[in-house]
Curated annotation (Swiss-Prot):
InterPro entries: Peptide/Ni-bd, SBP_5, SBP_5_dom. One of its GO terms (cellular component) is outer membrane-bounded periplasmic space. The keyword tRNA processing does not apply. Keywords: Periplasm, Signal, Transport. NCBIfam families: PRK15413.1. Transmembrane segments: none annotated. SUPFAM superfamilies: Periplasmic binding protein-like II. The lineage of its organism: Bacteria, Pseudomonadati, Pseudomonadota, Gammaproteobacteria, Enterobacterales. Residues 1-26 form the signal peptide. The gene is gsiB. The keyword Transport applies. It comes from Salmonella typhimurium (strain LT2 / SGSC1412 / ATCC 700720). This is Glutathione-binding protein GsiB.
Length: 512
């Protein structure tokens, strides 16, 4: 039964008020303050990293990613791939139970992948699984997955946070409402979900990893106000908070009871330019705008130093990423290129943003000022999620109003395909996926497709390098920065950290 708990947040002088009717803290109850709300507890139907991160309380996949974004076994013990790259045979961990008592086995894997790969279910993460032709039960501890075409990053897809193993009994019982009734093999099970306020999970006594979990419960609490989220740590109302607003970082670092952590990420921030529209169809214009942005200054102004200038179109910690010399800040060169392109007096355009939080606003204002110095007048619009879905993600090339678009991308598979194909492949123009530059290059398309058909690391490296070299030269983006992830936690909380894709890792979390 869902409990309903109400309270009113108050914040004054940087201190959060105490919370009325807040759930009583257990001996090892951890409160995690996060920056936005959750959309669903069904990982297959969530487009946001936060919902998938919280779902890791209940769910696990066959594989996962460690804090260095390397694939690790979780519910799988190993796998083999056929010579033609089409068939994956996976050996499963035995003796694992779902939280409703059902057995985890090959039939459970089949039920989940059949659901995920069926377009009739209209799941938001269908694109990850559309290459699955069939999933077969070999025996209770072995499953065989056949693909429609070779896809060498398939194990990374199975390691993606979306690929969770849900109890088949729960899928049958709850159907489309499974997002409200999570049942997995994870260390915690749902206790309460107040959809406007918090998700509370409690220790699953039947968890298969001996000695875990160490916490009694975790309360995931959305707190959209930056100051309130930081203040909850100061007052002890939360033991972990993310993201920490950059302007609050120095203050929290001085608190002897807290630890501030700036960790590496795979979150790249960039501005795409619609290369099918004037003036962005001209390569010299795109080069000019890249020369116009002082990325070192942007790091200081918008990110308080918690970012690094982008050195490519794929963050360095992603497999097969290529690094280049960052674009130098040279407004004189930018003006010269605009003149050569036929725009001696600059031009007017629009700059949209996929987010409207304070950091995005700072990036937009900084970029607007930088562009103005070379004669480019940009009218800025910071969008909410609904506007973004309708105006950017939902419209094709002919009807799209996108010209310049500030956004970010986190390739949660840890592999170059998911960092490149959704953003640069010709087939992935909106509304299919997120190629908001409407970029198209036949050689890039060929390289990306070929890289998925080979299991030879050297050949994959060559293909991904060639694709990135072309993209970097043709400049459909203004690559800006790779963010650092700033979190803070009570010093008596251990084993709880932020993953490079902005998800959470808390398998070994403990409260001393």
């Amino acid at each position: 039964m869902t409990q309903f708990i109400t309270h009113k947040w108050l914040a004054a002088l940087g201190l959060a008020s105490s919370i009325a009717a807040f759930p009583a803290l257990a001996a090892k109850d951890v409160v995690v303050a996060v920056g936005s709300n959750f959309t669903t507890l069904d990982p297959y139907d969530a487009n946001d990293t936060l919902s998938q991160a919280v779902a890791k309380s209940f769910y696990q996949g066959l594989f996962g990613l460690d804090k260095d974004m390397k694939v690790k076994n979780v519910l799988a013990e190993g796998y083999t791939v056929s010579d033609d790259g089409l068939t994956y045979t996976i050996t499963l961990r035995q003796g694992v139970k779902f939280q409703d008592g059902a057995d985890f086995n090959a039939a459970a894997v089949k039920a989940n992948l059949d659901r995920a790969s069926n377009p009739d279910n209209h799941l938001k993460r269908y694109n990850l699984y559309k290459n699955i032709a069939k999933t077969e039960v070999v025996d209770p501890a072995t499953v065989k997955i056949t693909l429609k075409q070779p896809f060498s990053a398939f194990i990374n897809i199975l390691a993606h946070p979306a690929t969770a193993m849900i109890s088949p009994q729960a899928l049958e019982k709850y159907g489309k409402d499974i997002g409200f009734h999570p049942v997995g093999t994870g260390p915690y099970q749902l206790e309460t979900w107040n959809q406007t306020d918090f998700v509370k999970v409690k220790k699953f006594a039947g968890y298969w990893q001996q000695g875990l979990p160490k916490l009694d419960s975790i309360t995931w609490r959305p707190v959209t106000d930056n100051n309130t989220r930081a203040a909850m740590l100061q007052t002890g109302e939360a033991q972990f908070a993310f993201p920490i607003p950059y302007e609050q970082a120095a203050l929290l670092a001085k608190n002897k009871n807290l630890e501030l952590v700036a960790s590496p990420s795979i979150m790249q921030r960039y501005i795409s330019m619609n290369v099918t529209q004037k003036p962005f169809d001209n390569p010299k214009v795109r080069e000019a705008l890249n020369y116009a942005i002082n990325r070192q200054a942007l790091v200081k102004v918008a990110f308080a130093g918690y970012a690094t200038p982008a050195t490519g179109v794929v963050p360095p910690s992603i497999a097969y990423a290529q690094s280049y010399q960052p674009w130098p800040y040279d407004p004189a060169k930018a003006r010269e290129l605009l003149k050569e392109a036929g725009y001696p007096d600059g031009f007017s355009t629009t700059l949209w943003s996929s987010h409207n939080h304070s950091t995005a606003q700072k990036v937009l204002q900084f970029t607007q000022q930088q562009l103005a110095q070379i004669g480019v007048k940009a009218r800025i619009t910071a969008m909410d999620a609904g506007q973004r879905a309708a105006e950017v993600e939902g419209k094709g090339q002919k009807e799209s109003g996108v010209r310049m678009f500030y956004t970010g991308w986190s390739a949660s598979t840890g592999e170059a395909d998911w960092a490149l194909s959704p953003l640069f492949a010709s087939q992935n123009w909106p509304p299919t996926q997120f190629n908001t530059a409407f970029y198209s290059n036949k050689q890039v398309d060929s390289d990306l497709a070929a890289a998925l058909k080979t299991n030879d690391p050297q050949e994959k490296t060559r293909l991904y390098k060639e694709a990135q070299d072309i993209i970097w030269k043709e400049s459909p983006w203004i690559p800006l920065v790779v963010e650092k992830l700033v979190s803070a936690h009570s010093k008596n909380l251990t084993g709880f950290w932020i993953m490079p894709d902005t998800g959470f890792s808390f398998d070994d979390a403990d409260l001393k």
